[in-house]
């Protein structure tokens, strides 16, 4: 709990704070656990005022139990499911991206992580008409590719332009720039500072590995702390502000078993609620469009399910024909 200060709660004045501090009562914990009769006598304060102050502080800082029914009702009213625009991926995600959760896309170089993120952003901006914050940390985002994906969804140039306006792109090439971006979003989300009306619904970070991995290993002890600070910011955006957060991560090889695994270690593995592993299909090669998506972690579905996605057709006439066929 915090330090006693003016404005912390009604009735807590500067004079009262100074008197309490003179008797070693500096924090909320000190005050609520103290003998108020003794404090009133020593500090010359009103006992009734101290009792009222403690009640306010307990109501403001204490944790109160919530029954399961109320929690479920709150979940139903606060959770939205946002389609990615990729049918096979939506199957793995149990219908799409969930607000309040962090979803991680894992894969090696050329596996299609950025293409998946761009497709998600395009679908949320155009199909769902929601705002997206796209944080690019590796220079993989190109406006022309984003426009190409939108052109496959609609031939109306005005609709394309409107969708592009809903996607806010920020470049952050180190951990400090990324933290600044996320903290600024958290601090201003209530003011609707995005380019279009409404707040940001989806945050895409492509990728966390690019800004975190240089800080890990060796004598850089603060790297783990910075990584967990980034994790807290992402979870705060998801859980407290009702956003769907998508991050990309690389893969690395385990030194003992030699198996491939997501980068950033065990501490990071607890951050995403859902993890999708992207891999090239054997024989297709990195230049081919087909990828195998595997559900590696989920709080809703059994893991191990696989779906094939063909990123080579996204933004092409073939995809446009498929979309038109789905609409008829």
From Swiss-Prot:
Q: Tell me which positions the record assigns to the signal sequence.
A: none
Under the GO molecular function aspect, what terms does this record hold? ATP binding; ATP hydrolysis activity; ATP-dependent activity, acting on DNA; ATP-dependent DNA damage sensor activity; DNA binding; gamma-tubulin binding; single-stranded DNA binding
GO BP field: DNA repair; DNA strand invasion; double-strand break repair via homologous recombination; interstrand cross-link repair; reciprocal meiotic recombination; regulation of cell cycle; telomere maintenance; telomere maintenance via recombination
Q: Which domain of life is it from?
A: Eukaryota
User: Where is ATP annotated to bind?
Assistant: 107-114
Keyword list (alphabetical) reads: ATP-binding, Chromosome, Cytoplasm, Cytoskeleton, DNA damage, DNA recombination, DNA repair, DNA-binding, Nucleotide-binding, Nucleus, Telomere
| Region named preferentially binds ssDNA | 1-83
Q: Name one GO cellular component term.
A: cytoplasm
Task: Identify the tissues in which this protein is expressed.
Answer: Expressed in colon, prostate, spleen, testis, ovary, thymus and small intestine. Weakly expressed in leukocytes.
Q: Where in the cell is it found?
A: Nucleus; Cytoplasm, Cytoskeleton, Microtubule organizing center, Centrosome; Chromosome, Telomere
Give the record's subunit note: Part of the BCDX2 complex consisting of RAD51B, RAD51C, RAD51D and XRCC2; the complex has a ring-like structure arranged into a flat disc around a central channel. In the absence of DNA, the BCDX2 subcomplex XRCC2:RAD51D formed a multimeric ring structure; in the presence of single-stranded DNA it formed a filamentous structure with the ssDNA. Interacts with SWSAP1 and ZSWIM7; involved in homologous recombination repair. Interacts with BLM; required for stimulation of BLM activity by the BCDX2 subcomplex XRCC2:RAD51D.
Q: What does this protein do?
A: Involved in the homologous recombination repair (HRR) pathway of double-stranded DNA breaks arising during DNA replication or induced by DNA-damaging agents. Bind to single-stranded DNA (ssDNA) and has DNA-dependent ATPase activity. Part of the RAD51 paralog protein complex BCDX2 which acts in the BRCA1-BRCA2-dependent HR pathway. Upon DNA damage, BCDX2 acts downstream of BRCA2 recruitment and upstream of RAD51 recruitment. BCDX2 binds predominantly to the intersection of the four duplex arms of the Holliday junction and to junction of replication forks.
Q: Which family does it belong to?
A: Belongs to the RecA family. RAD51 subfamily.
Linked pathology is: Breast-ovarian cancer, familial, 4: A condition associated with familial predisposition to cancer of the breast and ovaries. Characteristic features in affected families are an early age of onset of breast cancer (often before age 50), increased chance of bilateral cancers (cancer that develop in both breasts, or both ovaries, independently), frequent occurrence of breast cancer among men, increased incidence of tumors of other specific organs, such as the prostate.
| PANTHER family named in the record | DNA REPAIR PROTEIN RAD51 HOMOLOG 4 (PTHR46457:SF1)
Question: What is this protein's name?
Answer: DNA repair protein RAD51 homolog 4
> Which species is this record about?
Homo sapiens (Human)
């Amino acid at each position: 709990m915090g330090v006693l200060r003016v404005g912390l709660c009604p009735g807590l004045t500067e004079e009262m704070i100074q008197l309490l501090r003179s008797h070693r009562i500096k924090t909320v914990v000190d005050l609520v656990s103290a003998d108020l009769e003794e404090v009133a006598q020593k500090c010359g304060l009103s006992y009734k005022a101290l009792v009222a102050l403690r009640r306010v502080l307990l109501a403001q800082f204490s944790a109160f139990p919530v029954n399961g029914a109320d929690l479920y009702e709150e979940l139903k009213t606060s959770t939205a499911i946002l389609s990615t625009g990729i049918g096979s991926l939506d199957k793995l995600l149990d219908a799409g991206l969930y607000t309040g959760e962090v979803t991680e896309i894992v894969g090696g170089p050329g596996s299609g992580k950025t293409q998946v993120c761009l497709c998600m952003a395009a679908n949320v901006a155009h199909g769902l008409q929601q705002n997206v914050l796209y944080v690019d940390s590796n220079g993989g985002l190109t406006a022309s590719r984003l426009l190409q994906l939108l052109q496959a969804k609609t031939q109306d140039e005005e609709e394309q332009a409107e969708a592009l306006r809903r996607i806010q792109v920020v470049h952050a090439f180190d951990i400090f720039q990324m933290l600044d971006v996320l903290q600024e979003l958290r601090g201003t989300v209530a003011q609707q500072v995005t380019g279009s009306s409404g707040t940001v619904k989806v945050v895409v970070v492509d990728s966390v590995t690019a800004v975190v991995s240089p800080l890990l290993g060796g004598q850089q002890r603060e790297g783990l702390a910075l990584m967990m600070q980034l994790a807290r910011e992402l979870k705060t955006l998801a859980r407290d502000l009702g956003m769907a957060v998508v991050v990309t991560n690389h893969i690395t090889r385990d030194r003992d078993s030699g198996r491939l695994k997501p980068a950033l270690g065990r501490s990071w593995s607890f951050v995403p609620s859902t993890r999708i592993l992207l891999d090239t299909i054997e024989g297709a090669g990195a230049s081919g469009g087909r990828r195998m998506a595997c559900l590696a972690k989920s709080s809703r579905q059994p893991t191990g399910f696989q779906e094939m996605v063909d990123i080579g057709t996204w933004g092409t006439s073939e995809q446009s024909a498929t979309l038109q066929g789905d609409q008829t």
